[in-house]
Regions:
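Intrinsically disordered, low-complexity, charged terminal extensions of DNA damage-control enzymes
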Residues: 1-137
Length: 137
């Protein structure tokens, strides 16, 4: 008050910019029609089920890392989800893969069981695509 700064104090800096991540969401289906999923253990979306969710990379590279052999691939589309402190820019890909052992931390989930899993809203675009094109045909 005494320095004439009542209009500028207290100084509030704006909110921190949100961290942005580019993610590959992979709906991997084996020859038995099961979808590869895992239950998240990270703090973000803890205990919710998700499809393969990796930093953006070529699909074949992602499958190689999981020990899976691709038979066919289709682009699903892109989506974005804004969390309180992070933004996911997601690129969805469907891949038909040969039957293979389950990669560590993942499960092959029969299509009829997917709707019984707790899935994050962030992946709803890809769940809708799967519902329309894979498990409700």
């Amino acid at each position: 008050y005494q320095h004439g700064k009542t209009e500028t104090l207290p100084f509030r800096s704006g909110p921190k910019p949100k961290k942005e991540e580019h993610r590959l969401i992979l709906l991997a289906e084996d020859e038995q029609g099961r979808i590869l999923m895992r239950k998240r253990s990270e703090r973000l979306l803890h205990n919710l089920w998700e499809y393969v969710n990796l930093p953006v990379q070529p699909t074949q590279q992602a499958l190689d890392a999981l020990g899976l052999q691709m038979l066919e691939q289709r682009e699903i589309g892109k989506a974005q989800h804004v969390f309180t402190h992070i933004i996911w820019h997601m690129q969805g890909v469907y891949a038909k893969v040969q039957n293979a052992p389950v990669p560590e931390d993942y499960e092959w989930v029969p299509k009829e069981e997917i709707e019984t899993k707790a899935l994050p809203t962030a992946l709803s675009v890809f769940t809708k695509w799967g519902r329309k094109n894979l498990w409700n045909q």
